[in-house]
């Protein structure tokens, strides 16, 4: 890999800081090692490492500067010097801790030796589960919601994800807002690894069966959110990228989920995207309409709550998905 140009070094620095969640591998007196498993990057494009970038970084102090060695997918990528390295510690629980890397300007250097990377190290960290999301989220009040903009200008403009899910990018700090089933219904109706967001439920109701559909087919390009496994995985059951191909008067193919939206069986769903400037609503009827025999049906909003995810969890989820990562970082 050629990192000799300023542009390439800038892309590398941006990738390491903004697209990687770093987990500690070991901390020794002379060096620290961290690991990240990242999905494909929109800025750091390397043909050999297209869909998954498993990165190991070994940081050493040298005089007044810092030097680090980088390996990507088990291949030594280079050594770099910088006058500043900060690792911001993010604590979600005692068994789920990660770091965000902050770097000064980079230059290529050579230590005249290649350190041994712990590429096979298995991280002992807690996974992102629906229970963890419910435990750490905040319920969004009407007053908070009206300060957030779904359509139109505004400081707190939300970025749309799947149906009923959005992201607020506050200077690189991500907050996911989403409708989810009330906790009791989640326990009664869903497996423990599936977050019953409105995005996921609506997708499962109306997605098509065409294996070539770029919207409804599982693209299997996610990575595990806490870096425990290396390589791409199927769509995460806690992600918010679920977007069906048909959004207007879509036929319901999975009636088992209709009862979560309404007391009666529905024929069609209509996904609503506001056309006029408006703030965020706490009512699911603002974003999805149901129909029975061509007649509109009011959906049961009491089954749902609008929540704000912890920003530390939001970052782990969004950066593990190549679609969400590109949407929120624009």
Curated annotation (Swiss-Prot):
Keyword match Lyase: no
Role according to the record: Plays a critical role in cytoplasmic virus egress. Participates in the final step of tegumentation and envelope acquisition within the host cytoplasm by directly interacting with the capsid. Upon virion binding to target cell, a signaling cascade is triggered to disrupt the interaction with the capsid, thereby preparing capsid uncoating.
Gene name of this polypeptide: U65
Name of this protein: Cytoplasmic envelopment protein 2
Signal peptide start and end residues: none
Similarity annotation: Belongs to the herpesviridae cytoplasmic envelopment protein 2 family.
Alphabetized HAMAP family for the sequence: HSV_CEP2 (MF_04039)
A single GO cellular-component term on record: host cell cytoplasm
Subunit structure: Interacts with cytoplasmic envelopment protein 3 and with the capsid.
Subcellular location: Virion tegument; Host cytoplasm; Host nucleus
UniProt keyword terms in alphabetical order: Host cytoplasm, Host nucleus, Late protein, Virion, Virion tegument
């Amino acid at each position: 890999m050629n990192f000799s140009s300023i542009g390439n070094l800038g892309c590398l620095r941006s990738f390491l800081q903004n697209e990687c969640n770093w987990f500690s591998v070991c901390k020794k007196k002379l060096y620290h090692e961290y690991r990240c498993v990242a999905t494909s990057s929109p800025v750091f494009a390397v043909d050999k490492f297209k869909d998954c970038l498993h990165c190991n970084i070994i940081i050493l102090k040298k005089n007044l500067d810092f030097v680090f060695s980088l390996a990507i997918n088990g291949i030594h990528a280079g050594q770099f010097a910088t006058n500043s390295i900060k690792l911001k510690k993010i604590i979600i629980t005692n068994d789920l801790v990660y770091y965000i890397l902050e770097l000064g300007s980079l230059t290529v250097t050579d230590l005249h030796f290649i350190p041994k990377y712990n590429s096979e190290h298995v991280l002992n960290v807690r996974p992102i589960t629906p229970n963890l999301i419910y435990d750490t989220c905040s319920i969004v009040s009407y007053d908070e919601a009206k300060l957030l903009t779904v359509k139109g200008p505004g400081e707190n403009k939300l970025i749309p994800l799947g149906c009923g899910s959005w992201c607020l990018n506050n200077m690189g700090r991500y907050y996911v807002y989403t409708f989810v089933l009330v906790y009791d219904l989640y326990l009664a109706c869903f497996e423990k690894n599936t977050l019953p967001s409105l995005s996921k439920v609506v997708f499962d109701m109306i997605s098509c069966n065409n294996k070539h559909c770029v919207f409804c087919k599982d693209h299997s390009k996610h990575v595990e959110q806490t870096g425990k496994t290396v390589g791409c995985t199927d769509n995460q059951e806690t992600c918010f990228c679920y977007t069906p191909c048909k959004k207007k008067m879509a036929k319901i193919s999975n009636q088992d989920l209709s009862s979560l939206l309404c007391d009666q069986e529905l024929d069609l769903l209509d996904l609503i995207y506001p056309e006029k400037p408006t703030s965020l609503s706490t009512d699911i009827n603002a974003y999805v309409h149901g129909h029975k025999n061509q007649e509109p049906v009011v959906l049961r909003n009491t089954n749902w709550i609008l929540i704000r995810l912890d920003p530390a969890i939001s970052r782990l989820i969004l950066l593990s998905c190549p679609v969400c990562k590109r949407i929120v970082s624009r």
